[in-house]
């Protein structure tokens, strides 16, 4: 009977260390249960009553730990679902704000008609500059990283959140800035010691 107590304690320890899974644990408990039934039918004097009581107490404690674990997992799962719903809601609002912002005058394109002949009905789309606040944020980052002007993915995401631009717009801005702005910045800020 002491062997069964040791087996259940070892199984409990292995389970909580993730050395065995639910299926293995059930097999161990069923084997112990079968052994106890066999042992009980051969134990006519009842000398192992104390061992049986200890085994029952250990199993009850183990059972309560397993129930606690399942409750924690279900609470965690519920919180994950709630968090995902909140994130979806935030993303929806952000998309709506972005759509409204892109529709605003700051990012609207101006069509100019060309004069003359066949081209009179065609339109020319003018290149749009970003607002000064956005350019200032991006230039500040560029100035800070003159030696290696390539933002990482994390930095791009941070700049995207800070400016409200899409990642592709951030990429394009830096590609253009490395050709147009960076040479002048390097001349201006190089230290002539």
Curated annotation (Swiss-Prot):
Supply the SMART domains for this chain. HOX
InterPro entries hit by this protein: HD, Homeodomain-like_sf, KN_HD, TALE_homeobox
Tell me which UniProt keywords the record has, alphabetically. DNA-binding, Homeobox, Nucleus
What the entry lists under Gene3D superfamilies is as follows: Homeodomain-like
Annotated region of DNA binding? 123-185
Which PROSITE patterns did the record assign? HOMEOBOX_2
Taxonomically, which superkingdom? Eukaryota
- GO biological process terms on file: regulation of DNA-templated transcription
Any one Gene Ontology molecular-function term assigned to this protein's record = DNA binding
The record's subcellular locations are: Nucleus
Q: Name one GO cellular component term.
A: nucleus
- List the PANTHER family: HOMEOBOX PROTEIN TRANSCRIPTION FACTORS (PTHR11850)
Which family does the entry's similarity section mention? Belongs to the TALE/KNOX homeobox family.
Put simply, this protein is called: Homeobox protein HD-12
């Amino acid at each position: 009977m002491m062997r069964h107590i040791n087996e259940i304690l070892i199984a409990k320890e292995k389970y909580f260390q993730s050395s065995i899974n639910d299926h293995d644990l059930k097999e161990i408990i069923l084997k112990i249960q079968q052994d106890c039934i066999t042992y009980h039918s051969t134990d006519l004097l009842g000398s192992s009553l104390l061992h049986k009581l200890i085994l029952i107490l250990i199993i009850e404690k183990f059972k309560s730990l397993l129930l606690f674990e399942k409750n924690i997992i279900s609470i965690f799962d519920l919180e994950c679902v709630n968090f995902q719903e909140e994130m979806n809601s935030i993303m929806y609002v952000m998309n709506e704000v972005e759509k409204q912002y892109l529709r605003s005058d700051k990012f609207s394109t101006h069509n100019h008609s060309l004069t003359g002949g066949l081209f009179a009905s065609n339109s020319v789309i003018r290149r749009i500059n970003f607002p000064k606040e956005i350019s200032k944020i991006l230039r500040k980052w560029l100035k800070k990283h003159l030696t290696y002007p390539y933002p990482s993915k994390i930095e791009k995401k941070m700049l995207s959140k800070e400016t409200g631009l899409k990642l592709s717009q951030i990429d394009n801005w830096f590609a253009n800035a490395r050709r147009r702005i960076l040479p002048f910045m390097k001349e201006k800020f190089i230290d002539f010691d």
